[in-house]
Amino acid sequence: MFIHEIFKNADPKSLAMTGESNVTYGQLEKAVENYRNTLHAMGIRRGDTVGLYTANRAEFVYVYMAVVSLGAIIVPINNSLVDREVDFILRDAESKLLISDMPLTVSVPFIDIHDLDYRASTENAPKAPALPADLTEDDVCALIYTSGTTGSPKGAMITHKNQVRNVEQYTAVVRFKPEDKVLCVLPMFHCYGLTTVVLGSLYHHSTIVILRSKSPTEIINTIMKYSVTIAIMVPPLYNLLARRGEPSSMKTVHTFVSGGASLPQPVAQSFYERFGHPVQEGYGLTEASPVVSILPTAKPKYLTSGPALPGVEVKVITDKEGPYVPGTVGELAVRGDNVMKGYWKKPEETKKVLDKDGWLRTGDLVYMDADGYIYIVDRIKDLIIMNGENIYPGEVEDCIYEVEGVGECAVVGHPDPLRGQSVWAYVVMKEGFAFDEDKIRTVSYTHLRAHETCADL
């Protein structure tokens, strides 16, 4: 199956997207066909790369599906990047065209998405030819840029198979039904929002509820207005909602999923206490399309991202010989149909993370328990080394979160001329709580080893 075929056979009258406007599956299919014809008339062909820089909107989906249905390659770009950063990606990807919802100064041809929509709706361009017979599911359909496990932004080459399989793997655990209404507050340009919300919804003919604002009030109002049933978000949003939402505001939601970063246990607990719903934490990375694991509702555990998805293999690489001993920290490696083809035109960078047997080294430090559940410790590059001792920022952050009134915290390594690095923590208090350095230090001294305590707060 090709990624643009995932919404075929849906009831044409059922709702595909809502929010700013209602779009049925019949209208979606027609819009994609019109965009496809217009883009072909503009010269887009198989293998061309097309940049897409927009906020969450229905037209993002039209463009995405139209481009890949031509055998071309879509390059979704973070719409918070400035012109210079966007131009770097476009030049690196050798893009033939940029489609955007705002003006940008870049070195490739540009068309405003509103103009493209008008042309697709009114020009009646000649019908684009069918896909070449030799196009396969192993062809690249998307370049998703990431800093990856090393260095500067690189384009992860994601194939049709990668995306389709990851949607199938993910929704084997997080169940979608046609009657579900799925909140789309995650950015569509990001592989997390793209796969888990947009593609997951379309594959199962659910309704995408599009929201651009990340305001807790707007999220709550949208959930209530559209009777959202599945909410997929990032930890900071759960943190905000746990402090502000009314318990009754989430009564229509049967599934909450968190990803993009580790969900602090105090946040998960606060959310559960307020709304009575557990949050299924997942783990992934762009190079894996992106989902690798998720916590099932049938066998929930705290502080874990769950076992690997069906069809995904994982292992922990350590410096110890012999069989893996549960609880041992090492680097997570992943293998499966969801793993990228490689980095765009960077074979040497690809070799650093992807071996000949298909194992992707994630750059994440984890351990697994006897049941195969994955526990994220930290990014290798975030590891703090002080006097030769390894310090995991996540462990220090979890300790600081135990202090009453702490809303958010981040722990980083700071250069230290004597010890190599020292531990610095940045803390944001909840409304109504004063910052109390002595209290935080007392908790730290009680629960952490001496070298893990913060040099500065």
Predicted feature descriptions by range:
Residues 127-145, 152, 175-181:
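Conserved pre-ATP/AMP-binding loop-to-beta segment of ANL
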Residues 164-181, 189-230, 240, 244:
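Conserved AMP-binding/adenylation subdomain of ANL enzymes
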Residues 81, 98, 231, 336, ...:
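AMP-binding/adenylate-forming catalytic core of the ANL superfamily
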